[in-house]
Swiss-Prot record:
Transferase as UniProt keyword: no
SMART domains according to UniProt: YqgFc
Similarity comment text for this entry: Belongs to the YqgF nuclease family.
A GO cellular component entry from the record: cytosol
EC category: hydrolase
Keyword terms, alphabetized: Cytoplasm, Hydrolase, Nuclease, Ribosome biogenesis
GO molecular function: nuclease activity
One Pfam family cited in the UniProt record for this chain: RuvX
Protein name (Swiss-Prot/TrEMBL): Putative pre-16S rRNA nuclease
EC number(s) reported in the record: 3.1.-.-
Main location: cytoplasm
Lineage: Bacteria, Bacillati, Bacillota, Bacilli, Lactobacillales
Amino acid sequence: MRLMGLDVGSKTVGISVSDPLGWTAQAVEIIPIDEENEIFGIDRVAELVKKEQVAGFVIGLPKNMNNTEGPRVEASQHYGKLLQQRFPDIPIDFQDERLTTVEAHRMLVEEADISRAKQKKVIDEVAATFILQSYLDRHGRLVNKLK
């Protein structure tokens, strides 16, 4: 069993999964979505849930630096509700994702020397991995589901 990390954007959802023991997070893919037309890629998430044997979802919560919640927090919470409707037996938790995209950009530029064009293609995957790894490192409540 694994946990799935999700970085919900307005056009894509970055997906990561944990190893079966809950020690590390790995990037999986980016799912295109269209919020305006209510296309959320839930069918693709369902395929990945089955393939990866997902036991819990960890959704990034993009709070503002002053800890207030803006429209992107609402979008992440809405995505959580969609997952809850589709997968009522799989628990959901949220992880503060402040600065994960900034950290992902820094890592891609400084450490991996990735071009800007390629960054746009992988940034959400990397951010989803950072979100899930942070959750695993702090031993969020769903980590016990893996044991």
